[in-house]
Amino acid sequence: MTTILSVRRDGQVVIGGDGQVSLGNTVMKGNARKVRRLYKNQVLAGFAGGTADAFTLFERFEAKLESHNGQLTRAAVELAKDWRTDRSLRRLEALLAVADKEASLIITGNGDVIQPEDDLIAIGSGGMYAQAAARALLENTQLDARNIVEKGLKIAGDICVYTNQNHTIEVLDY
């Protein structure tokens, strides 16, 4: 699977992810880009789950962002509505972590939209390791959001066999 981690702190929101694509117990690719900028570089998004499914969701989410003038929450809710009513979407196995200058959201495979506590998002197979590391760093250090994401992903990659050390990190200042 993968690890995607997002942290918001001191006027920055950061989403980072590793690059490993696995098929069963085999590493198929080590440098996949699972974190992207969307809607005029104003929205960050990362995915965990099936790669083809995630690209389908990226496309649909980006279309919703365009049709709702970059309003992240509105676009996420509209995508979730589609997800629940469109039979082909209901079979997609992917999670999206999305963030802009105002909100951080998880869009789940069930069509749920969740705004996590403390604007900390961690999804994928290594998500819980990254989340634990990030939470400890948020509570006990003054590190900026980017450094917390870097360290959280590194720790997850050291522990989770489905997460590697090839990271893509995007930063949005606000």
UniProtKB/Swiss-Prot annotation:
Known EC number: 3.4.25.2
Listed GO MF terms: metal ion binding; threonine-type endopeptidase activity
Chain's gene name: hslV
Family designation: Belongs to the peptidase T1B family. HslV subfamily.
Catalyzed chemical reaction(s): ATP-dependent cleavage of peptide bonds with broad specificity
Activity control note: Allosterically activated by HslU binding.
EC category name: hydrolase
Chain sites annotated for binding Na(+): G157, C160, T163
Alphabetical GO biological process terms: proteolysis involved in protein catabolic process
Catalytic site positions: T2
Superkingdom to which the source organism belongs: Bacteria
Compartment annotation: Cytoplasm
Protein name, entry field: ATP-dependent protease subunit HslV
GO CC, one annotated term: proteasome core complex
